Amino acid sequence: MTVGYLRPTRILVDQNAIYENIQNELKHLEGTDTVIFPVLKANAYGHGLIPVAEAAQAAGAAGFCVALLDEALALRRANFTEPILVLGITQPSEIELAAANQISLTVGSLEWLQEATAIAQQVPYLHPVPIHLSIDSGMGRIGMRDEAELLAAYTFIKAHSDYFDFEGVFTHFATADDPDDTYFKEQSARFNQLMTALPERPRFVHVSNSATSLWHAACNGNIIRMGISLYGLNPSGNAIPDLPYPLKQALGIESELVFVKQVAAGTKIGYGATYEASEGEWIGTIPMGYADGWLRRMQGSTVLVDGQRCEIVGRICMDQMMIRLPKRYPVGTKVVFVGKSGDDEITLQEVADYADTIHYEIICDLSDRIPRVYTGLNEH
């Protein structure tokens, strides 16, 4: 994708915020042998894979989690040597590539192991691939669901140690960010029950996503898969406001006015002519649209200009949008979508609430054509 370096729209990423969020989690873990594997999937939740990995490494991350083998390989190409776990299912045909790059893979079934073995047997001098067995304790996504499945996979791995190294076992909680912990406790009990069936504990046993580490720390295994909290966002949204330590939001979004005009009452704005000026108004145009991730449902929300709230009027276009200004502002005036201006601030949570979604979706929808600008890490 072509990156729009020559227009004024920018995503601002504070690497120092990422550093501080990890440091605070490490303090939260003091006295334990638990380590942090930041979750860097989806371009580090839209923040930028390599710069976030650099900040996490500087802060003391012991390894990384990603969703795709491609993401793991990108980290290896950038000379990161820490352990990397692919949380999604990788095609068995890629076992040689994973082995050659010392990348740990998630396995959810005996069938995967059998297919991967048939491929591995054709590869001379294959280094054993580190395997993390996934237990489906109630998420309903991937993993072994009962003792028979788990033991069959474990037994197969031990019988084929030339190809596999039993490095870890894990589960994922569906409701760790919910004030009602009933189902969380059911999942936790189910995981512990299945763990007792294993003849040995591998090097890594992990259950904690961001929400689990924040509100159910007693359940922590020895890896925290630090996802959304790494980026300074509350996993629960507004549901559980109490946190064991402050989270510092790492991402901001800014642009500039590129066109300003005064319109008369009755003037219509945007596709579908859905907005009509009720009186004489100043209208500003911003070079950002739904192709950049600011979706059409954000019509009617506000941005900040000179510390003042300005409504998005008319339908958001693919590459541009219009706002109603309180007065004439010159072309080049800064516009804040996420961040502070004057005494006011727009948070990602506010944006998500308006869009009737979660902040995860807002940041992951941000297009790669918006340049990311990084600050802060040189302070450490």
Curated annotation (Swiss-Prot):
CC terms in the record's Gene Ontology section: cytosol
Residue numbers binding substrate: 141, 318
EC category: isomerase
In-chain residues carrying the UniProt-annotated modification N6-(pyridoxal phosphate)lysine: 41
Catalytic site positions: 41 (proton acceptor), 271 (proton acceptor)
Disulfides per UniProt: none
Requisite cofactors: pyridoxal 5'-phosphate
Gene Ontology terms for molecular function: alanine racemase activity; pyridoxal phosphate binding
GO biological process, one term: D-alanine biosynthetic process
Pathway terms, separated by semicolons: Amino-acid biosynthesis; D-alanine biosynthesis; D-alanine from L-alanine: step 1/1
Pfam families in UniProt: Ala_racemase_C, Ala_racemase_N
SUPFAM superfamilies: Alanine racemase C-terminal domain-like (SSF50621), PLP-binding barrel (SSF51419)
InterPro entries: Ala_racemase, Ala_racemase/Decarboxylase_C, Ala_racemase_C, Ala_racemase_N, PLP-binding_barrel
Catalytic reaction(s) noted: L-alanine = D-alanine
Keywords from the named record: Isomerase, Pyridoxal phosphate
EC number: 5.1.1.1
Purpose of the protein: Catalyzes the interconversion of L-alanine and D-alanine. May also act on other amino acids.
Annotated family: Belongs to the alanine racemase family.
Family annotation (PANTHER family): ALANINE RACEMASE, ALANINE RACEMASE, CATABOLIC-RELATED
Protein name (record): Alanine racemase
Organism: Latilactobacillus sakei subsp. sakei (strain 23K)
Gene: alr
